[in-house]
Amino acid sequence: MDITDFTAELLGLGEPTHFEPACARLRNDLFARLAEHGFRSIALETDRVAALDGGFSHDLGEVDANRQLLKWLREYNETAEEPLAFHGFDAPTETFSAPSPRTYLEHVRDYLGLDVDIAALTGDDERWSRSEAILDPAQTPGASPEARELRVLADDLLVALHARAPRLDADWWRAKTHATAGRGLLRYHAASAVPGDRETRIARLSGVRAVLMAENLLDIRAIEARRGPTLVFSHNVHLQRTGSGAGAIVGALLGDRYAFIAGSLGHSEAIGVREPAPDTYEGRLQRGTKTWRLADVPDGRKRTDTKPERGYFGLDADLLEGATAVWHLA
C-alpha cells in the first residue's frame, strides 16, 4: 500500500500522539510524495489565523519537523509553477483559555473601512483570555449583552465581506479567516458561560472546537478545490470518522471525498511506550514492520499500556471503524 493510492480530495493522516517526533518527520516525507501526485496544500492542527503568516499555536512551533516543513515549503515554492499552501485548521483556543475576539473583528472592520468601536464592546482583553473566563461560568463575558451584540456584529461583518466578494483579492480571504475566527471565539465563550459540572462543560467546549475545526477544513477545501487535494495532519481523535469530532463532521458532509488513515504506534522511547502485546492491534501491525508502513485495518484487541497523560490512547474498534487504512510506526 502506498500513500499515493488514496484519491480523496481531503486526506486525513492521524497521529497517535503529539509527542513522538517521528510522526511529524514522516509526515513531511509523505507530503513531499503527495505533492508529486497533485496535492497542493497541507493543513495542521494549529490556529488558522496564525498559519496565515507561517506561525504556530499550541506550542507546535517548538517541533523541529514543523519548522522544517515551512522551510521546505518556502524552498519548493521558489521554483514551483504551482505553489504549495500551508493552512492551520484549529481555532485560536486552548482547553482552558481563549483570547478576546477584538483583534480578529478589528482586522475585518479595517479591511472593510468601517467606523465601529469594537474595543468599546469587548473591553479589556484579559477579561476574555484569563482561565477563569473558561473555568467559571460566572466569570465569563461570553453571555454578556456586549457579547451578544458582538455576535450580531460578527455576522454583519461576514455579510459585508461576502457583498465585497465580486471585488475579490488576496486580502479578502485573510479578512474572512479573521471574521470566522472572531465569530468562533464568541461561540466558544458563549458555551463557556453555560452552567454545569466540569465534565459536561469540557465536553461542550470540545464539541464547539470540533465544529470550528470542521468549518475551517471545509473552508480550506473551498479555497483549494481548483488546485488539488489537501493533506490534513492531526491527532487521531480529531480526524477519526466515528464519534463527534471534526473528522466525523467532515466525513458526513464530504462522503468518500474524505479518507482517514489512522495513526498507530508500536513502541516509543519519547513517551515511554514499550513493545505491544502480540494479540493487540499494534502487536499484529508490529510484525514485519522495521520502521513504518501503511496497512489494512487489522484484527486484534485494544492495548492497555497506553499513556493518556501524553495523549496516547492506542487503537480501538471505534477508531478503526471508519479508517481506510492504518499508518503504523514501529
Predicted regions and their residues:
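Structural beta-sheet core signal
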Residues: 88, 232, 260-262
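C-terminal regions of proteins
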Residues: 1-9, 19, 238-330
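Short, contiguous clusters of charged residues that form electrostatic/catalytic patches at enzyme active sites
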Residues: 67-71, 211-215, 219
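Catalytic core of tubulin tyrosine ligase-like
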Residues: 235
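Structured, acidic catalytic/metal-binding patches in enzyme active sites
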Residues: 7-131
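Redox-cofactor binding/interface segments in oxidoreductases and associated redox assembly factors
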Residues: 44, 232, 328
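Extended, H/D-rich, highly charged conserved domains that either
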Residues: 96-200, 204-216, 229, 241, ...
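Hydrophobic N-terminal alpha-helices or hydrophobic patches in metabolic proteins across all domains
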Residues: 1-61, 77, 175, 198, ...
